[in-house]
């Protein structure tokens, strides 16, 4: 699935003015697709954007949770996993460049 396909699939959860997933790394898209199945069950869940900044992911979302520390923990966990996948993808790219 591409980022565009992902964004179309989850369009009901991406508010106007936001763009959702902003890059194409297949492993990241597959991971997010699985995670989104749970996230969309959270009351008030909105996906704002997922972007790379200095080769580190930023995962922006919002929920109706009163305890925003829960959002911060969830964000930390998701960003950590995506960063791992991004790093693996960039290492594969380097290997292909030198072989």
Stretches with model-predicted labels:
Residues 1-81:
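Long, charged N-terminal interaction/targeting segments
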Residues 69-99:
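Cys/His-clustered metal-coordination modules, chiefly Zn-binding fingers
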């Amino acid at each position: 699935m591409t980022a565009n396909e992902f964004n179309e699939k989850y369009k009901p959860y991406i508010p106007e003015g936001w763009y959702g997933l902003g890059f194409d790394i297949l492993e990241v898209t597959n991971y997010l697709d699985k995670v989104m199945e749970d996230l969309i069950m959270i009351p008030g869940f909105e996906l704002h954007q997922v972007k790379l900044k200095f080769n580190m992911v930023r995962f922006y979302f919002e929920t109706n949770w009163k305890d925003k520390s829960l959002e911060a923990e969830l964000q930390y966990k998701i960003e950590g996993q995506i960063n791992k996948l991004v790093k693996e993808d960039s290492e594969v790219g380097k290997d292909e460049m030198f072989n």
